[in-house]
Amino acid sequence: MALDIDTKNSSSAATGDANTVKANNNSSAASTGNKKTENLVNGNNNSAADGPAAKKKGKKNRNKSPPIATDAETTEAATTTAVTNGHEGEALVNGDAVAPDANANVAANDESESAEQQAAENAASSGELESEDVDLDALHDVGITVNISSPGADIISVQLSSMELVQEIHQLLMDREETCHRTCFSLQLGNNTLDNFAELKTVENLEQGSTIKVVEDPYTMREARIHVRHVRDLLKNLDPTDAYNGIDCTSLTYLNTITQGDLLDKKKTRPDSVDCTPPEYVTPGVKEPPLLPLHPNIKNAKGPQALKVLTTSAWNPPPGPRKLHGDLMYLYVVTMEEKRFHISACSKGFFINQSTDENFNPKPDNPSHLSHSLIDLLSTISPIFRRAFQTIQKRRTLRHAFERVATPYQVYQWASPQLEHTVDAIRAEDAFSSKLGYEEHIPGQTRDWNEELQTTRELPRKTLPERLMRERAIFKVHGDFVTAATRGAMAVIDGNVLAINPGEDSKMQMFIWNNIFFSLGFDVRDHYKELGGDHAAFVAPRYDLHGVRVYNAVDVEGLYTLGTVVIDYRGYRVTAQSIIPGILEREQEQSVVYGSIDFGKTVLSHPKYLELLRQAGKHLKILPHSVLNERDEPVELCSSVECKGIIGNDGRHYILDLLRTFPPDVNFLKLQDVKLSKELTEMGFPIEHRHKLCCLRQELLEAFIEDRYVSFIRIAAVHLQQLNAKKQDEAKEGTKEPASETEKESPPKAITEKEEEESKDQPTVGETKSAEAMVNAIREAQSNMATSNEVQAAEVVKRACAAVGSLKEKEFDFRFNPDVFSPGIRHVDGEEGTSSSIVKQKRLVQDAAEFLVLKQIPTFIKEHLAHSSPPIDGQTLTESLHNNGINVRYLGKVIKMLSQMPRMEYLYRIANLELIVRATKHIYYTYMQGTEPLHLSAAISHFLNCLLTNGPVNPAISKEEIHKKRTNTKYNKHKSSKSSGSGSKQSGQTSNQNGTSTSPSSSTASGGTSSNVAIDWTLVTPRSLWQQIRKEAKAYWDWDLECDAIDIALTKYGISRISLLRGFCQKVGIQVLLREYNFESKHKPTFGDDDIVNVFPVVKHISPRSTDAYNFYTTGQSKIQQGLFKEGYELISEALNLLNNVFGAMHQENGSCLRMLARLSYLLGDAQDALAIQQRAVIMSERVNGIDHPSTILEYTHLSLYSFANGHVGMSLKLLYRARYLLVLICGEDHPEVALIDSNISLILHALGEYELSLRFIEHALKLNLKYFGAKAMHVAVSYHLMARTQSCMGDFRSALNNEKETYTIYKSQLGEKHEKTRDSAECLRLLTQQAVLLQRKMNDIYSNGKLTSDLPPIHITPPSMGSVLDMLNTINGILFVQISQNDIVKVRSEIEKHLKANGEESEVNDAIKSIVDASGNNNGETEALINGGEESTVTVTATS
């Protein structure tokens, strides 16, 4: 089965979408029912691309995550149900940690539609899934086996899908060990040459068992260069240098190093006895973990060296006479035997010529070897090359396929070992060509990015295959665009690109490179003067990117956005955008047909734009509104005023400057006419932010509307009951006077207010169960009353609308006017009580901001009280905040709430660390802008010394240099005085093409004033830096950091230096040398110039999604919730199949599917399958997320459980040690997740008889569990029990007894005496007491007589069986099977309720009970519950058949 990786081939780019080549899953499996999924899930080793092929494929095969409301803590969302509008909605896919801030993905779900509409939609979508089964079969298609005969190799037989292209066979051959050295060949069937871009099913006479011949083709100049590049890639295949340097989408994975080979390897290549002693840095009590183990096995990574030098010769290009003899190019080679050769490439192949370094003699050497393959030629002239090449190939094919495929986007390492810099002509050529590596292969040279991006969006999307093709095209082009934009932005900052307005001040310059428009982040034309100057200009591109993301997610046909990427590099922010056709030839004023270019003074509208934006606005909850233009005429808009519409020369309708897509956040704006509520003013709001662009997140608006909808339904239901009761009374009592009726009809305002208050106080989750019933009741009531009393029915809805603050009087309507508080914009005010009433619109925006502080922040904290999936670092914390709709600028308020909760200490610590890192980032950006390129490494190392140490920090620069710096005002190319130059024609366009320009958001030495004054970096000291950090924390987050030196920060907040170093390096893109740093050094600075290895760009962009895969995934999840694991497994396998189809083999989303499939395999009893799938999930997470990413740690813990279940006991320990090391490195030992890992380690060590070690780990786990779950929690009971088991095996029965008593007490109080667990614990106590008494008697005997006299029975210490250890491991990790009958449901319900109440987690009770009750409603007789407590505290119930 060929892995689905998409090949990038030159000619494929001729069409607009540069990706004609698609690889489909080999689906011969489709016909064999369930086998299909295994084929999906167990790719075989030689199926992945590699070498240049991998690069090509990978490049085009970028991955994006679907716009999903990501599950912040990267746990399976398998058993969580999102409640939407009072009915059960789909659970959302876990996006596994998407880019740090802009890209927390969003489900563009229309939340406020009535429950009925949504229910209908859900039905429709599931119907759609079923109706498209036919398409899926078409996708799987049939498998075909063909034989391939190539010169000098055995005939090989391969299995292919009839939907694959002939090109796939090329890729396959270039990847196989025996044929990988060929690049220039064609394939023939009979005597016909096959077309590379034909699908196999269209090839005539191709049937099962046909033989395809490989025929060597003559070389051209281009083919010869491709061949040389391929050879170079094969030789450096094992070398991790590219991954450390962050090029070609290579990245690291260490799973194989840790497991010493493939876990599934049947041939016992791994040593049987694994040393189980934990390394020193893994045992409990480690303060600062070492850095070196982060990258294990660096020494042996490279593999043998085959050649000293392979480079293009200085005799190139061939002179005229030699061209006519067929010479294409000359190469120069130095072999390991120190022999020097000049090689000619001609159309027939490669031969050695007689040139030397001084004399050109292109005639063939004597004896002459002519080889079609350069590898063959080198093998004949160098025996060392031949042996080394074979070794490299063997090691390459032994590696897992996933280790060799390129990742979708570049993953950067924050630490790197000392790398050897080798001679590499191809690398040198790539660095200085402005091409993107493959450009010269593409007809028409540079790519028209805008055309490619828009054309792919226009592809048809009616059927499933069409949608897959469209999404694949969008994904590929987007991935290439991100790569190009990143490379261009670095070139711009490094000074390698000429500006389009070179005469202007360096801050005002704009650039075009490779058809991409670049602008720097400064407020160059006082465009943002009123909004916060450079600070506003710095954040604007990020808000613009948010806007582009949501409009892309809504995907309205006919509405176009620009390709947008925001890159932070060396302290500058660069915005890269695709170019609207014709924009550079026109003045901005002529271009804009919709919106305003001067913040609302002149406003235009356009009917087509109104129509398109109204469609999008429905999903985004944007209220169409009217504003007055300069002539006092009302102009209707369906977006913010800043949003501009430009019709390009291609006739497409583009929108740009989407920075105000969502309404402003009034808590951070000082506005005259806004009075915040008492609670908010007491908390210190409004806080004046340093720019006026703060807006609310889409997730917040959705949560707010959902909350209001639930209240609306409840209030309406209350009124209905009153009405019905009144009706019945009337029926009894006969008619009443109309007066009383009218009285009843308009209840005093106090009542509705009281109801509103009630509705706010009551927990909503439980209520939502009956919401659907309520909706139906209201509908029925309306239809019944339509005849009897329409007035009353309308009155019910009207009252409910008034109570929840709906925009419309008689219908539930929540939409937001993004311009409502914009200064200088004059609104057309509507009548009181209608949706166009400005007062109402303002009230709504205020309510949403208040909801964030009073509802969402407490909800966020309550969610984390259960510690079910706790954030591990700043990135997971940020995602979790974003999923709750909380902006990071509220971090100070979140920390304040956390500081009062001892059970949340770990989160308090992580939040403080994130705040310090972000504050430091702001300062670092201005600091870097004051640094000359010459002094970058000195400046960065000096900054790190000031941040992390108290030792000497003398900057390594001579006095003269410093003096020169002081006198020189222009510090840097991009950092000169601000000029008010009148814009040239092009610069006029930037604010429309590049909506905005940007600037360092940082505060400067003055803590928050203008950032135009660059900091002279040589003057910074540890004291001054920490004072700035404190000022920044107060100014930006309103949080008082009580530390003005690193030592105080470490003791006060419990953070570690390594965590701070990692967080900061990742945030700003620094790569430090991998070595052990002595932070306490008193004599020399901790960081020197040589410790700064590299600086990387930090890239923010949008991740395209795969909608059908997402639908399959969510349907699969709901099946799993109903306990239908097999169906769930099949649906999620199908989702993986589609993801492979769209994104290729490597992608975050694929990783989520793999983890879920592994979990399901394990639950279905197939531990071996679980191990195989989870191994791939680990490699994928390491490669796509990073080797020390929180989700990688999670994958390692899962893998250790499955490898234990497969009998790899020592191996599962090694995996847990790795997970624990990474976790402690990132967030320290004091974390609930460490308790889980320690319990696992302790159990396995116990199973191996290492009782002393086992005890150390379980004691640490117990300490953490007591701290975070409280003395009455189940986690604690289990820890006590594990401790008792270990102590009894050590013969310490007294301690064991005391610990088991604790367990018994907790079980008894939580579960009651009759519960099985309580009874087990009582039995355990009895046995322990018996053994303790025996031991005591023996001891007394010895004390009294000096020897044993009485004949006492021996004491039995039985080591636990592996089966019992596995059961216990399952329990700890939350995989627990319980049999419950229908009658037990009620008992379980009350038990769970009692247990969770004790821990104060009410909302979870409702979820847990709801899922039990729902499932038990569907099943009769016996049911089996899967209580999943480790990651998700949820209960699903499955019917036992």
From Swiss-Prot:
Per the record, the major location class is cytoplasm
Keywords for this protein: Cytoplasm, Phosphoprotein, Repeat, TPR repeat
Q: Does the keyword Repeat apply?
A: yes
**Example GO BP:** asymmetric neuroblast division
The subcellular location is: Cytoplasm
**Amino acid composition bias (Basic and acidic residues), ranges on this chain:** 726-753
Stretch list, region Disordered: 1-79, 106-131, 726-769, 961-1009
Cite the source lineage: Eukaryota, Metazoa, Ecdysozoa, Arthropoda, Hexapoda
Q: What spans are recorded as compositionally biased (Polar residues)?
A: 8-22
Q: Where is the composition biased (Basic residues)?
A: 54-63, 964-977
Identify the PROSITE patterns for this entry: CLU
Query: Where are residues bearing Phosphoserine located in the sequence?
Result: S273
**Originating gene:** clu
Q: Name one GO cellular component term.
A: cytosol
Tell me which Gene3D superfamilies the record gives. Hypothetical protein (hspc210), Tetratricopeptide repeat domain
Q: What is the documented function of this protein?
A: mRNA-binding protein involved in proper cytoplasmic distribution of mitochondria.
* Pfam families membership: CLU, CLU_N, eIF3_p135, GSKIP_dom, TPR_10, TPR_12
Q: Spell out the protein name for this chain.
A: Protein clueless
**HAMAP family attached here?**
CLU
Q: Which family does it belong to?
A: Belongs to the CLU family.
- Organism of this sequence: Drosophila willistoni (Fruit fly)
